[in-house]
Amino acid sequence: MMGRGKLILIEGLDRTGKTTQCNILYKKLQPNCKLLKFPERSTRIGGLINEYLTDDSFQLSDQAIHLLFSANRWEIVDKIKKDLLEGKNIVMDRYVYSGVAYSAAKGTNGMDLDWCLQPDVGLLKPDLTLFLSTQDVDNNAEKSGFGDERYETVKFQEKVKQTFMKLLDKEIRKGDESITIVDVTNKGIQEVEALIWQIVEPVLSTHIDHDKFSFF
């Protein structure tokens, strides 16, 4: 029986090289791979999110924007599952973990990790999650484009990193073996690419039954 495709997620702070590595991996896995970037800004919900991220005058409560981010993931999940069942691999640039970490890092009353994860319960879990970690968040601020969108400040990114680590540690302690933290501090694009491929290649060669999925 033909196995399904693999769902591979690359997570991390802003300007840590996620998108670059997603694009590299996507091209490497052609012709049988699709690339998804969250938020998916081409949808109606994604358009609202894009406006919020790029226009400081567009105000929403922390709870409302968090639920919009989650809704943006839910509106695409059936398409993701369909592609996987057809045997296609999918590389994702951000997903549930980003949504939870960025919202919980705001410190809004009542929005702890458990509350922030609740709207995503039932979404597909990746077969592999790679978190690109850096020891020097300050260096990210010097990269082109940093600060163009809401959340791109060094102070907030430090909070997000701490929240990410708490969230991932919690998932790992619950027995999730699909998460790997990759230290990209002072590493070049090709060096990170090689590290990622060492982790991804064995997952690609593993057979996963057509109807076997994990969920948040």
Swiss-Prot record:
Gene Ontology biological-process annotations: dTDP biosynthetic process; dTTP biosynthetic process; dUDP biosynthetic process
NCBIfam families to which the protein is assigned, alphabetical: DTMP_kinase (TIGR00041)
Cross-referenced Pfam families: Thymidylate_kin (PF02223)
Keyword list, A-Z: ATP-binding, Kinase, Nucleotide biosynthesis, Nucleotide-binding, Transferase
PROSITE patterns: THYMIDYLATE_KINASE (PS01331)
Single GO MF annotation: dTMP kinase activity
GO CC list: cytoplasm; nucleus
Catalytic activity: dTMP + ATP = dTDP + ADP
Matches recorded under Gene3D superfamilies: P-loop containing nucleotide triphosphate hydrolases (3.40.50.300)
Recorded coiled-coil stretches: none
Organism field: Saccharomyces cerevisiae (strain ATCC 204508 / S288c)
Protein's UniProt name: Thymidylate kinase
UniProt xrefs under HAMAP family: Thymidylate_kinase (MF_00165)
Listed SUPFAM superfamilies: P-loop containing nucleoside triphosphate hydrolases
Family stated for the protein in its record: Belongs to the thymidylate kinase family.
Pathway(s) this gene product operates in, as recorded in its UniProt entry: Pyrimidine metabolism; dTTP biosynthesis
CDD domains assigned: TMPK
Function field: Catalyzes the conversion of dTMP to dTDP.
InterPro entries found in the cross-reference section: P-loop_NTPase, Thymidylate_kin-like_dom, Thymidylate_kin_CS, Thymidylate_kinase
